[in-house]
Amino acid sequence: MANPEFYGLSTTTLSGQPFPFKDLEGKAVLIVNVASKCGFTPQYKGLEELYQQYKDRGLVILGFPCNQFGGQEPGDASAIGEFCQRNFGVTFPIMEKSDVNGNDANPVFKYLKSQKKQFMMEMIKWNFEKFLVDKSGQVVARFSSMATPASLAPEIEKVLNA
């Protein structure tokens, strides 16, 4: 059964367009807080490779730029979009820059964190934490920044084959 809490969420794309999560019903979703000036930034390449490998089977990857960790996403929407395209050829959707922790955290991350804690804590610890959501909208896994995109393939396969 579809999860109304997850599919009731919405956000805004980097270009300012509404992005209702109801459009994600029936898809596997990988949600990542991203940054342009982080030691983990090269993960964009692996995320794009995952997207190309699995998008036709129903995987959507959503990147959420965040400047809360070391000020590593200082740019505006146009600078972020240009960086992602020029350096990594990113074609998966990038959302508007937002906080992932604290009172002003994006509601998407408030929800994700409430569903999957990391080491008994809800707080996002750094850029490039990842949440995997199954085709019915259930948060099934959370991965640290250290988890490479390629290492997620077995979990993504499980979700896509379910």
Curated annotation (Swiss-Prot):
Gene this chain is encoded by: GPX5
Triggers of expression: Strongly induced by singlet oxygen generated from photooxidative stressors (by high light, rose bengal, neutral red, methylene blue, dinoterb, nitrofen, the antioxidant biosynthesis inhibitors norflurazon and isoxaflutole, or a switch of dark-adapted cultures to light). Mildly to moderately induced by oxidative stress (by hydrogen peroxide, tert-butyl hydroperoxide, and paraquat). Not induced by salt stress (by sodium chloride).
Function: Has thioredoxin peroxidase activity. May also have glutathione peroxidase activity, although this activity is controversial. Protects cells against reactive oxygen species, which may include photooxidative stress, hydrogen peroxide and organic hydroperoxides.
Enzyme Commission (EC) number: 1.11.1.24, 1.11.1.9
Taxonomic placement: Eukaryota, Viridiplantae, Chlorophyta, core chlorophytes, Chlorophyceae
Pfam families: GSHPx (PF00255)
PTM: S-selanylation may increase or be important for glutathione peroxidase activity.
Family: Belongs to the glutathione peroxidase family.
Phenotype caused by lack of the gene: Increases cellular levels of reactive oxygen species (ROS). Decreases cellular levels of triacylglycerol during oxidative stress (induced by nitrogen deprivation). During oxidative stress (induced by rose bengal or nitrogen starvation), increases expression of genes involved in energy generation and decreases expression of genes involved in photosynthesis, flagellar processes and iron transport. Sensitive to photooxidative stress (induced by rose bengal).
PANTHER family linked: GLUTATHIONE PEROXIDASE
Major subcellular location class: cytoplasm
Other observations noted: Two alternative-length transcripts are expressed that differ in their stress-dependent induction. The longer product may function during photooxidative stress. It was speculated that the longer product is directed to chloroplasts, but this is not observed during nitrogen replete or deplete conditions.
Keywords: Cytoplasm, Detoxification, Oxidoreductase, Peroxidase, Selenium, Selenocysteine
Name listed for the protein in its UniProt record: Glutathione peroxidase-like peroxiredoxin GPX5
Protein location: Cytoplasm
